[in-house]
Amino acid sequence: MSQYYLYQDLSKCIACYSCVIQCKSIKQLPVGPKPSEIVTIGPRMIDQRPRAAYVFMPCFHCDNPWCVAVCPTGAMQKRPEDGIVFVDADRCVGCRLCMNACPWGAPQWNPETGKVVKCDFCKDRLDQGLKPACVTVCTTQCLFFGRIDEMPEEIREKFKESIGAKVVEVP
């Protein structure tokens, strides 16, 4: 399991895309690949007003990542010390098996390099004691990042409540 946790306060996100843009910028990516994405939920009418929610979707850094399991060269790896799933670009041959294996679409094709890229929680920044780039530029401070055991209880409770409130029965 990833030891890190990225929480989004859905009530604060305005879909400004600064997190997505900063991710692409710091990874020097061309148009096309998006290691993180904002998914719009809605709009739906709440109190006779249209409302939408914007969900930030980076890689989930799965416990047993299918992308790692199918990679024939070992380019897609999971760091044992913290569970971060990342691509070793020197080993990637561009076969795209990881892209087909991931149900979330986290691995993305970079047409300029002919290799796969993905969210790695900015592991190089983490190793320097910094937060991921997406968190540092969030204009509404709706993104929180940390180790699961260090995440404040109120954030964990708010996450539980916000996700539970967004689950609705579909007729």
Question: Positions of the model-derived regions?
Answer:
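Non-ligating segments of multi-cofactor redox enzymes
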Residues: 1-171
